Amino acid sequence: MEKKKIGLLVMAYGTPRKKEEIEPYYTHIRHGRKPSEEALADLQERYEAIGGTSPLARITDEQANGLAAVLNEQQEDIVFVPYLGLKHIDPFIEDAVQKMKNDGIETAVSIVLAPHFSTFSVQSYNKRAQEEADRIGGPTIYTIESWYKEPGFLQFWKEQIENEMKKADSIDDLCVIFSAHSLPEKIIQANDPYPEQLRETADLLADMANVPNYEIGWQSEGNTPEPWLGPDVQDLTRELYAKKGYKTFMYCPVGFVAEHLEVLYDNDYECKLVTDELGVRYLRPPMPNADTRFLKALADVVTKRLAAVVTK
């Protein structure tokens, strides 16, 4: 019997794959407005600092294909066909939905490579996918809104944190800073669950890994005049050092799933500048990337979503 094909729509932010794509990528983020020469030079310098371009494009491909491979090892009657849809660079989300339609895919499950729900990220990805499917008459897409409580995801971070804590001279002198991408403060007025989901993730992981001292921070805020969620991780580091005198800071950007510009530059370069300035130790566990433990956790998320549909 031929296996039923189901589309696996993996959505992510996207990143420039080469230097020539930096300007059009940021122009898309800015809704068609080109960045100034000064802003563009700053962006190019950041990419140069992490090796020229971000490894995110490669990692996202590995995550999408790896997730499909894990799912297909588990399934007997279904074959998942991966489609990558990106927010700010090709293949765009709409391209992926169109390709599924062209390939004869009638049913798909979508997952965003971000564990926490927010109106700015996950909701906007799912909305774009659904609107395109409605426009072209299919496929039927079953969306996933968040997966930060998935046991395998939490277990992955628990193990990473425990391994990294072994490097600290004293657990009492260590502070773990859990972080995610900052968003405009106005999401709080809209009752967006994003900040609370980060807090919940931090509490769960601190409990699982027996972390005695931890705080919540925000990072990588946009360059706009409106207020963004804080405290910023760098300011928080200075404040905690002044008040508590911690000798080691461990940064856990649990809102991200890959080593990209926000981690390799904003954490490994900018936060490390702060810890060096304070004369304290900098630690950061390896990110999920395409780690098998992480891919299995995502596979569990997708399988549960599909089961909920089938059993209705």
UniProtKB/Swiss-Prot annotation:
UniProt KW keywords: Cytoplasm, Heme biosynthesis, Iron, Lyase, Metal-binding, Porphyrin biosynthesis
CDD domains on file: Ferrochelatase_C, Ferrochelatase_N
Pathway linked to the protein: Porphyrin-containing compound metabolism; protoheme biosynthesis
Residues that span the membrane, as ranges: none
Annotated catalysed reactions: Fe-coproporphyrin III + 2 H(+) = coproporphyrin III + Fe(2+)
Protein's cellular compartments: Cytoplasm
Keyword ATP-binding annotated: no
Binding-site residues for Fe(2+), renumbered to this chain: 181, 262
Biological-process GO terms, alphabetical: heme biosynthetic process
Top-level taxon: Bacteria
Class in the EC hierarchy, top level: lyase
Record InterPro entries: Ferrochelatase, Ferrochelatase_AS, Ferrochelatase_C, Ferrochelatase_N
Location (main, coarse): cytoplasm
GO cellular component terms attached to this protein's record: cytoplasm
Keyword Lyase on entry: yes
GO MF, any single term: ferrochelatase activity
Binding site for Fe-coproporphyrin III: 13, 30, 46-47, 54, 125
Entries under Pfam families matching the protein: Ferrochelatase
Protein family according to the UniProt entry: Belongs to the ferrochelatase family.
Functional note: Involved in coproporphyrin-dependent heme b biosynthesis. Catalyzes the insertion of ferrous iron into coproporphyrin III to form Fe-coproporphyrin III.
UniProt xrefs under NCBIfam families: hemH, PRK12435.1
Record-given protein name: Coproporphyrin III ferrochelatase
UniProt organism field: Shouchella clausii (strain KSM-K16) (Alkalihalobacillus clausii)
Gene name in the database record: cpfC
